[in-house]
Amino acid sequence: MGKEDKTHINVVVIGHVDSGKSTTTGHLIYQCGGIDKRTIEKFEKEAAELGKGSFKYAWVLDKLKAERERGITIDIALWKFETPKYYVTVIDAPGHRDFIKNMITGTSQADCAILIIAAGTGEFEAGISKDGQTREHALLAYTLGVKQLIVAINKMDTANWAEARYQEIIKETSNFIKKVGFNPKAVAFVPISGFNGDNMLTPSTNCPWYKGWEKETKAGKFTGKTLLEAIDSIEPPKRPTDKPLRLPLQDVYKIGGIGTVPVGRIETGVLKPGMVVTFAPSNVTTEVKSVEMHHEQLAEGQPGDNVGFNVKNVSVKEIRRGNVAGDSKNDPPMGAASFTAQVIVMNHPGQVGAGYAPVLDCHTAHIACKFAELLEKIDRRTGKATESAPKFIKSGDSAIVKMIPSKPMCVEAFTDYPPLGRFAVRDMRQTVAVGVIKAVEKSSAAAAKVTKSAAKAAKK
């Protein structure tokens, strides 16, 4: 397999704060990843000097995190590792205070979640207790459409690799993930030590009783022994090239001698020079002159690509971050007058009722929206209504809500365009709720601007 032929997949690592997420992720990146040996040796030396030798993998990760949080643009390759089949990017490990927001507006949808559970006495119980963040993160992943899961039972060395303990944990965890919505039969359970490396890349000699993991999905039956093999058995994502174009703008630049250059990540569809695109909710239509990525011209940009594209006769004042570009001839994007969404309240101290108007983060847009009407309260797991027209909802509740944006914004139903159909509700400087959009009432188009070049291109 040539270097270029491997599929890229994204994983998100979830679990309780002390489950060993950093150590486990650090180990994978360390052994199969983009951290060059020099950096590692530097980190190891620092760790040893500070008496943190026992944390070496986590230390590597902490260094990367610290640099990333200080805004030093850290080489993102450091968060990647390679398996025989895939290039894997670790999207964001929780614990990061913006984890939830990142997971929703995040640069990408995770293809699989890796749930890390600590086997130590008391640790496991704390991790999946009722108020545990583990439950919250797992539910969040599931609600946001992450349908594949791997469970790694970590710190097996602290449980002396006892088979009985492992079986007990598997039984409990199976019930736990079933309640969240995952099917345990389709999940690989792997006993590991993220620190010592058991069953990470090579089978451990410490658990002769362990015959390997197995999972059964629509695609068939898979078996293996290590965490790496479990990651390799993730089903590859179908990238949405066949859908109409949706490209939320991250920035719009004015470049001397070239003109206006919007920049963003293609979420669905393709973008090619010569295409006529419409920006919503600005309602501007124009022709794309050129498309480039990493300073190279592209014949075609695809989902996942972060591109800049040059548009003709459009000023920087007319389009902005949060606008969405789409193909003017194929389901062009439009502003939303209102939308209904399933909203899950996560950590709001009080009650939320009609009239609440927090800020929504949806793709690159950041706009206040009013909870106009609480239509029904629903059971998070089954999606069935439990109460119609509730007066209030509080933490832990889920409801179908009609929402009205305070100013024009472009969103879509989650089933049509997932990245444009999930949002975080921010208030008091934290994520207080998350939502998945069910339906959108598009606004009747205001006066539209169509540039001359677009009109000319349309006649061709």
From Swiss-Prot:
User: What keywords is this UniProt entry annotated with?
Assistant: Cytoplasm, Elongation factor, GTP-binding, Methylation, Nucleotide-binding, Protein biosynthesis
G4: annotated segments: 154-157
Name the PROSITE patterns for this protein: G_TR_1, G_TR_2
N6,N6-dimethyllysine modifications at: 3, 317
* Region feature G2, mapped onto this chain: 71-75
Q: Where is the tr-type G domain?
A: 6-241
Q: Where is this region: G3?
A: 92-95
- Assigned protein family: Belongs to the TRAFAC class translation factor GTPase superfamily. Classic translation factor GTPase family. EF-Tu/EF-1A subfamily.
State what this protein does.
Answer: This protein promotes the GTP-dependent binding of aminoacyl-tRNA to the A-site of ribosomes during protein biosynthesis.
| The name this protein goes by in its record | Elongation factor 1-alpha
> Per the UniProt entry, what species is this protein from, by scientific name?
Hypocrea jecorina
Question: Which classification does the entry list for the species?
Answer: Eukaryota, Fungi, Dikarya, Ascomycota, Pezizomycotina
